[in-house]
């Protein structure tokens, strides 16, 4: 009995040692930031550091060296090895840390929902109390390693995939908004100051993104569209036709009449990203020989996909924060793209008589801020595990085994989100025609 009781204690001690350095670094950096920057900027940076450390630990869980050390420190309680029989816990460990970050932000969102967002109490909870937050994150991390593996398998296969899909859709809305905003600013500079650099950036980036999208499409045809792979051929062809359609739509005379700034610059960005999504989706298809030659061999391509996905994640978080902070200072002509989320992301102006400090510190909705991080945690876990699915079973000796493999769920998530991206961009082009009073040129 003593030996059994000592296992959880040894595990907690081991995990404390593993994440101790990261936690110490996090506490030091966060406290120094929040002490020097008493504003939303300090809070955003602090939460970003926490997200980065949690993601870094999740990535370490996929390292054989890190897992072997942690297994030894836990006296064999934690097993992370991936053997030929399919026994593998490293993917589950990633979902455990994802669960930690999700519960952390959901808890803060729940607490903040009980307070008035404009109150000093809510501002204090959002921007301060970092020693308590670090302890909360640490305790949740320890607790996550005692959650049954079967629950984590359900978490990773169902909940995490749905959360990842929502994060991608939200990121796509921001991507379309960014495409319009960036292109319009370049056009404005060209029209007002005849800036040669703006012309170069606008034309060069447009051509460059079309070239990248075309190259990705060709690579998809070459590697994934063999004569027997009709599904891959259909998906890639549909995406190519959609790219051509949205490009033609962006320069249609009617669209240009209601929004002269619309053009190929925005559609090129949409094409570039959707072509990447299709390539990534087919690369995640369960290995069926010629239809997915990257299924088991090309680990480098999967690492590249992780890098692109990580860049997309940080872009979404950063741009979401920037939009929330700056939206009150500029008119948003494309707010109809994401009216609900934008309304949640930015609160209404404070009533007259409020202090300048409150006006500065409560210019966005704290609850939506944490929801974005919840979705980002889901997406990061799916990204690090290559959207793998897990199946848990027990043998006659009651040993728990976890099988790792690809599934069509991840494939369809990426395919559908690419179609959603096209749909969002089409809507952004047509909305000024249908609702000209909401579109201010």
Curated annotation (Swiss-Prot):
In the record, what terms sit under GO molecular function?
A: phosphatidylserine floppase activity
Claim: Nucleotide-binding is one of the keywords in the record: no
* GO BP, one annotated term: phosphatidylserine metabolic process
Q: Principal localization?
A: membrane
Q: Membrane-spanning regions, if any? A: 1-21, 41-61, 97-117, 128-148, 158-178, 206-226, 235-255, 263-283, 307-327, 364-384, 415-435
Per the record, its GO cellular-component terms are: membrane; plasma membrane
Q: How does it sit in the membrane?
A: Multi-pass membrane protein
- Asked whether the keyword Plastid is assigned, the reply is no
Q: What keywords are assigned to this protein?
A: Membrane, Transmembrane, Transmembrane helix
Please state which protein family the record places this protein in: Belongs to the TDE1 family.
Q: Indicate what this protein is called per its UniProt record.
A: Membrane protein PB1A10.07c
Task: Tell me what organism the protein belongs to.
Answer: Schizosaccharomyces pombe (strain 972 / ATCC 24843)
């Amino acid at each position: 009995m003593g030996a059994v009781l000592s296992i959880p204690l040894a595990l907690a001690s081991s995990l404390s040692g593993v994440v101790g350095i990261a936690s110490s670094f996090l506490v030091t950096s966060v406290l120094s930031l929040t002490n020097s920057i008493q504003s939303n900027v300090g809070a955003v940076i602090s939460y970003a550091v926490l997200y980065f450390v949690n993601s870094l630990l999740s990535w370490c869980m996929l390292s054989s060296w890190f897992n072997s050390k942690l297994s030894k420190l836990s006296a064999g309680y934690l097993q992370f090895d991936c053997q030929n029989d399919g026994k593998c816990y490293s993917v589950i460990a990633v979902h455990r840390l994802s669960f930690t970050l999700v519960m952390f932000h959901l808890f803060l969102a729940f607490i903040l929902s009980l307070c008035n967002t404009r109150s000093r109490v809510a501002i204090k909870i959002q921007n301060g109390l970092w020693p308590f937050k670090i302890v909360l994150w640490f305790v949740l991390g320890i607790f996550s390693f005692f959650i049954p593996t079967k629950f984590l398998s359900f978490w990773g296969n169902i909940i995490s995939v749905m959360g990842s899909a929502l994060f991608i859709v939200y990121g796509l809305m921001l991507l379309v908004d960014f495409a319009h905003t960036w292109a319009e600013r370049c056009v404005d500079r060209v029209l007002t100051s005849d800036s040669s650099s703006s012309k170069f950036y606008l034309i060069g980036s447009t051509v460059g993104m079309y070239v990248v999208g075309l190259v990705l499409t060709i690579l998809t045809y070459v590697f994934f569209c063999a004569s027997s792979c009709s599904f891959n051929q259909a998906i890639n062809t549909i995406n190519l036709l959609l790219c051509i359609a949205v490009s033609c739509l962006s320069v249609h005379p009617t669209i240009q009449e209601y929004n002269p700034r619309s053009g190929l610059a925005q559609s090129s960005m949409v094409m570039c990203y959707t072509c990447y999504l299709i390539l990534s989706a087919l690369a995640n298809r369960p290995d069926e020989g010629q239809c997915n030659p990257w299924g088991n061999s090309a680990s480098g391509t999967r690492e590249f996909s992780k890098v692109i996905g990580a860049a997309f994640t940080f872009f979404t978080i950063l741009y979401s924060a920037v939009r929330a902070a700056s939206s009150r200072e500029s008119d948003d002509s494309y707010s109809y793209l994401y009216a609900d989320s934008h309304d949640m992301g930015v609160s209404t102006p404070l009533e007259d008589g409020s202090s300048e400090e409150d006006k500065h510190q409560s210019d966005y909705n704290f609850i939506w801020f944490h929801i974005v991080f919840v979705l980002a945690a889901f997406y990061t876990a799916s990204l690090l595990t290559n959207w793998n699915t897990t199946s848990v079973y027990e043998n006659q000796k009651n040993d728990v085994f976890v099988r790792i493999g690809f599934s069509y769920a991840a494939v369809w998530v990426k395919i559908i989100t690419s179609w959603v991206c096209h749909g969002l961009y089409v809507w952004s082009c047509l909305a000024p025609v249908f609702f000209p009073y909401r579109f201010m040129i």
